[in-house]
């Protein structure tokens, strides 16, 4: 069953990345690889949130968690495309842009990961908490 979770997650992540990258590239045809940058940072934010939330707050089986993180987010984000795009910038003698991309990707990824962790640990509002408790008791 684990492989099914990984396969479905991987399929969703890869297809999602393809469509989102195509959409962003139509909007931003510039030299800076914005699509990959946005996708990778979004993946870092989601990874931080999902791992923290599912390990600390939400009961979730390890197979589903692995399908969401390794499968879906692993296929959604892409280190290889980041590397190729950086190399193309360097080969095209766009060294300042390549360095900006490197720094913005690495620092941005760490910041987004930490932001996801922070968001997952925010306390639930009393209204949201009472809504969850009411649903668990069956008193809707």
Swiss-Prot record:
One GO location term (cellular component): plasma membrane
Activation and inhibition: Na(+) is not transported, but it plays an essential structural role and its presence is essential for fluoride channel function.
Keyword line: Cell membrane, Ion channel, Ion transport, Membrane, Metal-binding, Sodium, Transmembrane, Transmembrane helix, Transport
GO function terms (MF aspect): fluoride channel activity; metal ion binding
Pfam families assigned to the protein according to its UniProt record, in alphabetical order: CRCB
Residue positions binding Na(+): 74, 77
Entry's family note: Belongs to the fluoride channel Fluc/FEX (TC 1.A.43) family.
General function of this protein: Fluoride-specific ion channel. Important for reducing fluoride concentration in the cell, thus reducing its toxicity.
Protein name from the UniProt record: Fluoride-specific ion channel FluC 1
Organism the protein comes from: Moorella thermoacetica (strain ATCC 39073 / JCM 9320)
Gene: fluC1
